[in-house]
Amino acid sequence: MNATAALPIVGVDLAKTVFQLAIADESWRVVERQRLTRTQFERWFVNRAVGLVVMEACGSAHHWARWLTALGIEVRLLPAPYVRAYVKRNKTDAADACALLEAARCADIVPVRVKSIEQQAVQALHRSRSLWMATRTSRINALRGFCREFGIVISPGSRVGVEQIGRVLADPRSAI
């Protein structure tokens, strides 16, 4: 589980366009900090031997973990709530990268398993469906509220509610 002694350990704070790196030696002391764009980030790892990369398990982390693993680099994804406890000063990208290195040393923090593309796709479908269901319920409840303002009570349940609202709107005798 330890990185190869001669190879550096890198804490990476991921962002949309700029990534912050904290590079540590074999004794986990930060010896260098770098701020890289996405293209520079890719070039940096392709052209360098690294023993371990530590990232927060957040958006795009699984993509980068798979990419780095394909290069033969060991990757650890740490749960975000546990990493926050290791930020020593104001929350900045540089402080987060250093906090990742500190958190990686803690044996109590269990790393997140890197998801395959298929696992991520299934998770995205489930989340999209949940979001759609939540917004559907919200829209139906809003329509129920509007109907109540006209003295029309709509039965509970999404299917029944939608059918009833449709009938009320189509009825020329309704107040709406």
Where are these regions (language model features)?
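A detector of single, family-specific signature residues
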Residues: 1-176
